[in-house]
Amino acid sequence: AMIKDELKESFARDIVLLKYLGIHPIIVHGGGPEINQILDILKLPVKFVRGHRVTDDKTMEVVEMVLSGKLNKQIVSLINSKSGNALGISGRDGKLATAEIQKIEVADENGKTELVDVGFVGKITKINKILLQSLLDAKTIPVISPVAEDNNGQALNINADTMAGAIAGALNAEKLILHTE
């Protein structure tokens, strides 16, 4: 996620410019620093395994609150302030993204690997292309938080770059741009 206001403004202007040039941007955002900040305030542990946030039930609540509530709405508002017609959703909305729990492969000092359970961390199994295409056909700029759900309705934390790649692949996108501050 972007922290600096001038970068946020520039990003929003660039996204709206792409739209007016006939390109159909879809935004998938992360929010690691903001999630960490709220976890610290709540005195909940922040732990990663090979770049994946260990996500228990309380952490998943914070992840979804920060990504789908706070940050998604801020990004939508910023793009809309530039006449962008953005619409915020999460991967859970309309079953945009279905996922399954992902275990992370970790090697010990001897090179032996094992699968580690990192909680409610998922890998995408399906993208709802019809929903995405309908949002694009409605001339909106979808702004998507990387929270998906499994077949039982359990919220899963998805790496934003992974979600963006899955969406780009599902839509046969010509370009995938990964942006970070």
Go through each PLM region and give its residues.
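Nucleotide/pyrophosphate-binding catalytic subdomain
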Residues: 1-180
